[in-house]
Amino acid sequence: KMVTVLLTAAMATAMAAGCGKSSDSGSDKKESYTIGIEQFAEHGSLDNCREGFLKGLEDEGIKEGDNLTVKYKNAAADMGTAKQISDSLVSDKVDLVCAIATPSAQSAYNAAMKADIPVIYTAVTDPVAAELADKDGKPVGEVTGTSDKLPVEEQLKMIREMLPDAKKIGIMYTTSEANSVSAIEEYKSLVKKYDFELVEKGITTTADVSLAADDLLSKVDCITNLTDNTVVASLPTILDKANEKKIPVFGSEIEQVKIGCLAAEGIDYIALGKQTGKMAAKVLKGEDHRAWILCK
């Protein structure tokens, strides 16, 4: 089996956009809160986001079991389920929704936009492509959060240094995930600079992963992962097949390296979630958010 040889953690930049219910004075603050956490899939990076999010809230004096009630729901990487969860949390009139991963962020925002419920997202690769911000990076409504945009050029540079003779690099991605489509476009713009040819393989569900992996592995010298929820949830299958063919697989964050990817230039998702939790605490406490702007 392949062994972990390298991991470089790159902290993501927080993206702050107008969000949340503002109050004119401290007397309007609630003493306790109910929030919904909608997570698109269960895998290491998103689980770490959730863990960090709750730690960030706790650092700001909002602690589950004390003055915080959490309604956690997981969509199991299914868009239809994500919509049901979003609608349910809005129906429950939670004080805030934390949406983890791009599909859940889109679903939560669409459900909450007319209900005056703020949405704080995390692990969203490209808020503009996901239509959570406009083309200038300005907020589109009651939504803000943090981005886990991939350091694509650093990843390509690392792969080239580790595999000087590799020619074809493969990427599997979910065609319905805006974050993945955006990342693919960035890879396309940079692969030639590092003397690679990009081979893409699109899928729609986890059921496609096994055959897609077989096809991709027959055409490439290595594979690099995105922060694609459907693919990452099926990563053990891809790694097993890649190990049989002795084809290295590069991850996009530390949890993927822990389970067998060769290396990654990626993000500390606990720290990302923690930063998001601190942002959520400010919204819950009624801090005036109108001065917040979306950073690049």
Each language-model region and where it sits:
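An alpha-beta-alpha
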Residues: 35, 53, 144-191, 292-296
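Hinge/cleft segment of the Venus flytrap/periplasmic-binding protein
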Residues: 282-296
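Beta-alpha junction/loop-to-helix N-cap segments that form part of ligand/metal-binding clefts
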Residues: 74-134, 228-243, 247-250
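Pocket-lining segment of extracytoplasmic ligand-binding domains
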Residues: 172, 178-253
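Short, low-complexity disordered leader/linker segments with a strong preference
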Residues: 1-34, 59-63
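Structural motif
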Residues: 69-91, 202-216
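Short beta-strand elements at the ligand-binding edges of bilobed clamshell
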Residues: 129-160, 259-274
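Extracytoplasmic "Venus flytrap"
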Residues: 34-60, 71-80, 176-180, 230
